[in-house]
């Protein structure tokens, strides 16, 4: 028996025998098959429906073997993620109309965009666990535009998978992050809360509480010399158990205070001179009034002489 006669008998038997009823599926979108689609992909999609293959038995007819080889072999241009995902969605003996590929593609987009942004592991978990599901679908008559729809959806899924293929481990910005002591962002974050505000260095400097002995020695040194050399400043700081910076700042403040006191004293002296002059002027006016001729005439008139 020749091979062509065996194939013809299978085709005649297939056309005479009514096709088994298959569960109804949701119709996919109607698109036209593009003319530039690769031939292995078209053969794997539009392969002949063998009765023994539909019933689940093992079939060794040439058409079934050829379609199986084309479906199991990856496409020649599979590179990156787009063509590989399209081959996994369409080939492999598990494509059915629009229902065999769409559930698989929807499973890849199951996490929300926010979840994919802050927790990329969720999308990877769905991506790795869902693809084995497409091997359990049964063969159905291929609709005219289901291959193009599956290819377009597979390309979109591949683009999303490529975008999520490199997860950014520092994506959750709002998570609890710990900065180093030298990082200026640490102070910004600490200023937002109220627990660590005591550790934030503010612009105010703590006042040094000098003892009476220290103040006495500093005043004595200032009365003898208002400006200190560095060696003398170090000696005083060591003797009084202070830092060199504390002694320097104290002398600076003391000089400012001394200048203010000098200005205040000069002002007081100037005002006191004015007061004395005004009092003398008033006295002279009073004497002149008492010695005026009118007053003398009055005295003369009152006098009995």
Curated annotation (Swiss-Prot):
DNA-binding region of this protein: 203-262
Protein name per its UniProtKB record: GS homeobox 2
Gene Ontology CC annotations of this record: cytoplasm; nucleus
CDD domains to which the protein is assigned, alphabetical: homeodomain
Keywords: Developmental protein, DNA-binding, Homeobox, Nucleus, Transcription, Transcription regulation
Any one GO molecular-function label of the UniProt entry: sequence-specific double-stranded DNA binding
UniProt-annotated location(s): Nucleus
Location, primary (coarse class): nucleus
Keyword Zinc found: no
Gene behind this protein: Gsx2
């Amino acid at each position: 028996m020749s091979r062509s006669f065996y194939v013809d008998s299978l085709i005649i038997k297939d056309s005479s025998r009514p096709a088994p009823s298959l569960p109804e599926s949701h119709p996919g979108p109607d698109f036209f098959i593009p003319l530039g689609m690769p031939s292995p992909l078209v053969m794997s999609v539009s392969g002949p429906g063998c009765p023994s293959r539909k019933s689940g038995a093992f079939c060794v007819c040439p058409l079934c073997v050829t379609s199986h080889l084309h479906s199991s072999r990856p496409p020649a241009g599979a590179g990156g993620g787009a063509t590989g995902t399209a081959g996994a969605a369409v080939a492999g003996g598990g494509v059915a109309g629009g229902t065999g590929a769409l559930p698989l593609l929807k499973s890849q987009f199951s996490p929300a965009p926010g979840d994919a942004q802050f927790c990329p592991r969720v999308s990877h978990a769905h991506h790795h666990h869902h693809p084995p599901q497409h091997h359990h679908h049964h063969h159905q008559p291929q609709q005219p535009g289901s291959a193009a729809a599956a290819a377009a959806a597979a390309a979109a899924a591949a683009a999303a998978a490529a975008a999520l293929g490199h997860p950014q481990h520092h994506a959750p910005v709002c998570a609890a992050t710990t900065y180093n002591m030298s990082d200026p962002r640490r102070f910004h974050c600490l200023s937002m809360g109220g627990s660590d505000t005591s550790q934030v260095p503010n612009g105010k400097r703590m006042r040094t509480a000098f003892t009476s002995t220290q103040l006495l020695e500093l005043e004595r040194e200032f009365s003898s010399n208002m400006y200190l050399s560095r060696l003398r400043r170090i000696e005083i700081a060591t003797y009084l158990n202070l830092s060199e910076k504390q002694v320097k700042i104290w002398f600076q403040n003391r000089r400012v205070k001394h200048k203010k006191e000098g200005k205040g004293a000069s002002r007081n002296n100037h005002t006191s001179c004015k007061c004395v002059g005004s009092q003398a002027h008033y006295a002279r006016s009073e004497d002149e009034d008492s010695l005026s001729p009118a007053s003398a005439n009055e005295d003369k008139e009152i006098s009995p002489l």
